[in-house]
Amino acid sequence: MHKLSTLVPFFISVGLAQAAPSAQNYKWDSVKIGGGGGFVPGMILQRIVFNTKEKGLAYARTDIGGIYKLNSDDSWTPLTDFADNQRWNYWGADALATDPVEPKRVYVAAGMYTNSWDPNNGQILRSSDYGKTWSVTKLPFKRLAIDPNNNAILYFGARSGNGLWKSTDYGVTFTKVSSFTNTGSFIVDPSDSSGYNSDKMGIAWVTFDSTASKVGGATSRIFVGVANSGSNSVFVSNDAGSTWTAVAGQPTTYLPHKGVFSPSEKVLYVSYSDGSGPYDGAKGAVWKYSIANSKWTDITPATGSDLYFGFGGLTVDLQKPGTLMVAALNSWYPDAQIFRSRDSGATWSKLWEYNSSGGVNRYFGWDTSLAPWLNPPGNTDTKHAGWMIEGLSINPFDSNHWLYGTGATIYGGHDLTKWDTSARNITLKSLADGVEETAVLALISPTSGANLLSGVGDIGGFVHSNFKTSPRAAYTNPHYVTTPDMDYAGKKPATIVRIGNDGSDASIKQIALSTDAGATWAPYAPTPGGLAGGKIAVSATGETILWRNSNGVTVSRNSGAFTSVSGLSSNSAIASDKVNGTVFYAADGNKFYVSTNFGSSFSATSASLGSSSSPVKIASNTNKAGDVWVSTDKGLFHSTNYGASFTAAKSVTQAWAIGLGAPKTSGGAAAVFAVATIDGVTGYFRSDDEGNTWVQINDAAHGFGAVSSNPISGDPRVYGRVYVGTNGRGIFSGDIA
């Protein structure tokens, strides 16, 4: 975890970026998957935030995909696409606050991890123009709230035992609140050597009592929830943060996930769970604390055997005092559960409930028209309402409008008060249009069929026949939760292979084969059980599959059994020649290997990949046999003779993903797309002359996050077109402007 250091303000404008050696304007668009595709929850945090002063203003924050702003048509606009390789952790939005006094101001606590996975400290992003541009204050470490009576004051609750911090200048600088000494003791797994689960959760939330008196212009009463289990976890200051005490009489069994203040009632509502979220939760409670009589009341909406979850997302209806909602964390079967009360928690109604015959009465319709893959044909999953619900909000100006985040999308609707009628027939809609929070692992652009197919984390992947509409369904037969790699046969492009990453069920073959361009699939029968992941390559003529997995490199020809390939390590990069069906390639260290017998055996060529120790990607030309490129940690290398000799691309000192696309002129050199460092600039580049000259194609508004995570593919049918996959912002298509 990061040690505390001096707090230094550090400013970055979205419009500033290091100039590339040369640049070409590109038009970038999202390839629509729709529905979000990722977690919009909250660990112990709120993830969908409405502004209480400006009607219709709301933001959503995601764990790996940055920040979005709500539009009037229910769609969302991304606000942090500028994040580049140096600022990739800006996409980890750990907290968000929208100013209740000056709505144009918005603040984000950004950072990915507190262990070694993210070597950077956190930062506060601050905007005074609704997120169009940002300035940055670097933090020594990461929960964020704005004083409703003095909006220059911000409080920030940190992780890792770093305590409570305060700003009095709109977030430009922060100082530690030394009087707040309880920084949270809960650790998910102290034995986790990676540091991911062995860090202190820290401060969970900060909530102001907007009805309290002022001290020096600041709100006097402030509540802070801390990740303590078995001891006091809710603390209060009655003197604008000068001193703090534990709120007397509070429950101490569980962790406080959300703290929401209802001004009209002068009541603090708190949701609790026995786990930190977002996946866990087996017990929990909901309590309220009355300012008037300093009394805590247990208002948990489930008891006994009906209580098999904790509680996460929590919201109040500011238009209807006493109306609140809370989400189960987690009810995995048959569906997520949400509770609603109109009498301050005295009684509750449910989103669904069991009937006398053991079936389920659902009091909602399910509309996934904006993301039909959430409910594909033949869907038998009982989970319609979602899972992992940490972010739950009712629009403060509209009692019918509500939103909540799940592990896959944002749900909500515009008829919430129908819940309170005898019919209870609300419509639950996927309302995440514009949110593209997928982690993309593989992209291919075959020479025929759909221009793009994707391999995606958590939701499998898709055939993208239309970039403007959401796919009807993810891959099936089999459906893999995550697709780490794909390939197509260069001479028979309708033949496509993909792999899954979970070999725990040996009966599910982790290679799938399509012979109709991804329209239908079948498990590849020779695939051995228990193996998964790695990299995959299919021969140009489609009859041979080369698979690198944890057992090394194996090959199957004509649907025969997989056999080991000698001479290659399980670290080898692999690929097929896209024209010559007998040839496969491999690279390991600074050596390049070629097979001319359908992958049965490989021999190292005499050519060297310079001082490379880690080849990343091999890409072969769809139009020329033996024309192959290799990206490495020490540069980019090109061969036109099956790897017998290589030429190092000029000025390229490191390269990650590469892809080849249609040539500028018919019969000319393939366009080469590279995620690389060229002349000291790290970015996204294209060369039309075999790497002799380059143009940078990404710009200050499109950074695409961490370069090491992102696959790239040129389009062999459209000159200049490139597809970029990101780790949290989905897929982008780029064309010359």
Q: What feature does the model see in each segment?
A:
Residues 1-9:
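Classical eukaryotic N-terminal signal peptides for Sec-dependent ER targeting/secretion
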Residues 11-14, 18-737:
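Extracellular glycan-interacting surfaces
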